[in-house]
């Protein structure tokens, strides 16, 4: 929530017995207090990291985006000498914030260990057995890009069997974000946006030891995969 804080003393005298208090409205995190002590004249004190303990029950209960408030107070001898307030957006647990703010957070919705994927992977293995006589997913062990393509195709074929219906995402979703259906919802509801389906496919690929990629363009998202045992150095790359 807060990485670090710097308290500046711009006066000509040292400030003694200085403390910090951070409160949250609604209480999506516990009140944070910190004793700084003395700040010399024309100096500053940095608090890093700021160890905020979040209220997971409240955050998981959110069903829509809401705006919260953060209040930071600087105290001297327990009395307020400075107050700073700002707002923060709180998202429901299935909301992605879009490309404008930490786009790499989309990776949190790729869930290769989700139990709903097991039947899909099992169905995909039957396609592998039919095509090459071996149902095993070997990831990159063979160092053969064509084998990786076969594994990708098998998972894709298994997902096609699910008869999932495509539905349009919200306008400008890639910028402002959207609600994302996790695998169990897509497979149960039999529908999903391009991002829902891309995230589902990526989860299946990662579940069998492959390295998926998510590509975003105006109004659309697609999933790809490395054909070699490689990854980008950075989690988010602009083209």
Features from the language model and the residues they span:
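Short beta-strand elements
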Residues: 79-112
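Secondary-structure boundary elements
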Residues: 113-189
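Short, hydrophobic/aromatic beta-strand segments
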Residues: 12-21
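Short, solvent-exposed loop/turn segments enriched in Ser/Thr/Gly
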Residues: 1-4, 65-69
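Intrinsically disordered, low-complexity Pro/Gly/Ser/Thr-rich segments with frequent PxxP/GP/PP motifs
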Residues: 22-65, 77-80
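Asparagine-centered strand-capping/turn motif at beta-strand->loop junctions
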Residues: 5-12
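Contiguous beta-strand segments within globular domains
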Residues: 1-4, 48-50, 136-137
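Hydrophobic/aromatic-rich core segments of domains that either
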Residues: 192-239
């Amino acid at each position: 929530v807060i990485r670090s804080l710097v308290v500046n003393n711009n006066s000509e005298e040292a400030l003694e017995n200085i403390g910090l208090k951070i409160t949250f409205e609604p209480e999506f995190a516990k009140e944070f207090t910190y004793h700084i002590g003395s700040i010399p004249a024309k100096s500053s004190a940095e608090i890093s990291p700021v160890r905020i303990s979040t209220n997971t029950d409240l955050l998981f209960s959110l069903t829509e985006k809401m705006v919260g408030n953060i209040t930071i107070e600087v105290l001297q001898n327990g009395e307020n000498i400075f107050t700073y307030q700002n707002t923060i957006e709180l998202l429901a647990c299935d909301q992605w914030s879009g490309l404008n703010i930490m786009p790499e957070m989309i990776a949190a919705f790729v869930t290769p260990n989700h139990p709903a994927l097991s039947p899909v992977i099992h169905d995909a293995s039957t396609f592998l057995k039919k095509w090459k006589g071996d149902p095993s997913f070997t990831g990159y062990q063979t160092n053969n890009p064509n084998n990786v393509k076969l594994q990708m195709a098998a998972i894709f074929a298994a997902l096609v069997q699910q008869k999932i219906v495509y539905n349009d995402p919200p306008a400008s979703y890639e910028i402002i974000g959207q609600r994302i259906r996790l695998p169990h919802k897509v497979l149960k509801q039999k529908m999903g946006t391009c991002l829902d389906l891309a995230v589902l496919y990526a989860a299946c690929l990662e579940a069998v030891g492959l390295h998926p990629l998510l590509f975003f363009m105006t109004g659309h998202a697609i999933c790809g995969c490395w054909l070699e045992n490689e990854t980008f150095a950075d989690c988010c790359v602009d083209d």
